[in-house]
Amino acid sequence: MNKNVMVKGLTALTILTILTSLGFAENISNQPHSIAKAEKNVKEITDATKEPYNSVVAFVGGTGVVVGKNTIVTNKHIAKSNDIFKNRVSAHHSSKGKGGGNYDVKDIVEYPGKEDLAIVHVHETSTEGLNFNKNVSYTKFADGAKVKDRISVIGYPKGAQTKYKMFESTGTINHISGTFMEFDAYAQPGNSGSPVLNSKHELIGILYAGSGKDESEKNFGVYFTPQLKEFIQNNIEK
């Protein structure tokens, strides 16, 4: 991998910080991470109980998005790294709003191709006794996207360091080729798996990496082609 390309999840090479309020553990990266040349239109989402924010979940070191019954889409490297600590996700946690509960992971289905895409199924009842599907919304798929479309990225950058505050950034699609897309919405470690949404809050894809010398100048996502959408839809719990 190019040394200037970094995935947006937090690595497992650092000190483990226990976040009892979320019910799972988080590792904090020692490496410097920030983004310079990406468009920096960022706002904190303090109340994540409404759409599209209540479809976003926090993983250990990353983010995911709910697409159906007990079903979350994220990156392979986030789904795998979650096994290192605890198999648990937190539904739309935010600094002021009511969270949707903490849910244990049931199983993981990785996309068989090269794309950094995985499906995570969770148990329906949270550790607090909440029902997953009554506390989240399901994000709809976009029909497609094109260069210069405006987008938003929602997730948990620097999760433990920000006490899992949710942030939304906006930007523009710069390039699409096959299942690859490049855009300039601001992102940081912890944004891996974050949904990339169009202006209608429909799901275009998920973020997986960024590129830059000291700071990320570009961000990359898995673009949901019809083939990828079919894979996801076939793995939504019935």
From Swiss-Prot:
Disulphide linkage map: none
Pfam families in the cross-refs: Trypsin
Signal peptide (residue range): 1-38
EC number(s) given by UniProt: 3.4.21.-
Induction cue: Negatively regulated by sigma-B factor.
Active site: H77, D116, S192
The protein, known as: Serine protease SplA
Organism: Staphylococcus aureus (strain COL)
